[in-house]
Amino acid sequence: MSMQDHDRTEQGMTSLAVTRHLDGSSRPDWDRVAEETPVALVFNGISHAVMMATPLDLEWLAVGFALSEGIVARRAEIFDIESDFVCGGAEVRLEIAQPAFLALKDRRRSLAGRTGCGVCGIESLAMLDLSPEPIAGPAGPVSADPAAIARAAAELPAHQRLMQATGCAHAAAWCGRDGGVRMAFEDVGRHNALDKLIGWLALEGMDPADGFVFMSSRASYELARKCARTGIPLLATISAPTSLAVDIARRAGVALASFCRRTGFVEYTA
């Protein structure tokens, strides 16, 4: 299995010539803009999804997508992964266990237009999975610890290099139970950032029950569903949740905290 270097200081963005207007005057300048490119995910030689993503950490993205979308149930079902930049985009090829591949073919997903959001690309509402199984997480109920949330909120900005440079990226951070940020991934799509993090957890052999996810975005349905499917016990977000995200989190036993700041947060499930 090949893995790209995890050096992202100047990747994921490009510099463009712009005209900057301020206080009635104009001047030529340069601006850094986040990159967005089509990424095709290919399973056992068959293209399954094409999504728009920041071209960073794509092998983590593919593994996380496979797990969070239920294509594979565990890391051991992924045998090999390779990635290349081709035809103006990127292609990530995964070799997965045959039973998982046969089940994937039966799901009748669209071969193009997927966004990674868990809804786009399905063929009917009947195929939409809104009934998650309870997560196999900690034995007791999980709730958001105020000190841990405050620490995560304080530490996250230092891990948002792409956002600071471009103003155009979401971050998904893995935090220890004490709230310390252990790793963070950025992408123009919040669901992509989370999939990259989920892929990293799987490839590093991390236990999802040993920490929580802290995100710079709102809490949407697909984020709650991805956390539920991969056994993450707590999702904390800076912005608001949707009603469906709250419902999914409650059904799955995922603790959900939003409007997370250093000074407080709102707990929607526990």
Curated annotation (Swiss-Prot):
Q: Does the keyword Protein biosynthesis apply?
A: no
Record's subcellular location: Cytoplasm
Q: Which domain of life is it from?
A: Bacteria
Q: Where is this region: Disordered?
A: 1-30
What gene, per UniProt, encodes this protein?
fdhD
Query: Is Ribonucleoprotein tagged as a keyword?
Result: no
Skewed-composition ranges (Basic and acidic residues): 1-10, 20-30
Report a single Gene Ontology molecular function. sulfurtransferase activity
Active-site positions, per UniProt?
A: 117 (cysteine persulfide intermediate)
PANTHER family named in the record = FORMATE DEHYDROGENASE, SULFUR CARRIER PROTEIN FDHD
Gene Ontology CC terms? cytoplasm
Q: Lineage in the entry?
A: Bacteria, Pseudomonadati, Pseudomonadota, Betaproteobacteria, Neisseriales
Name its GO BP terms in alphabetical order. Answer: Mo-molybdopterin cofactor biosynthetic process
Where is the major localization of this protein?
cytoplasm
Q: What is this protein called?
A: Sulfur carrier protein FdhD
Organism, scientific name: Chromobacterium violaceum (strain ATCC 12472 / DSM 30191 / JCM 1249 / CCUG 213 / NBRC 12614 / NCIMB 9131 / NCTC 9757 / MK)
Question: What keywords would UniProt list here?
Answer: Cytoplasm, Molybdenum cofactor biosynthesis
- Family per similarity comment: Belongs to the FdhD family.
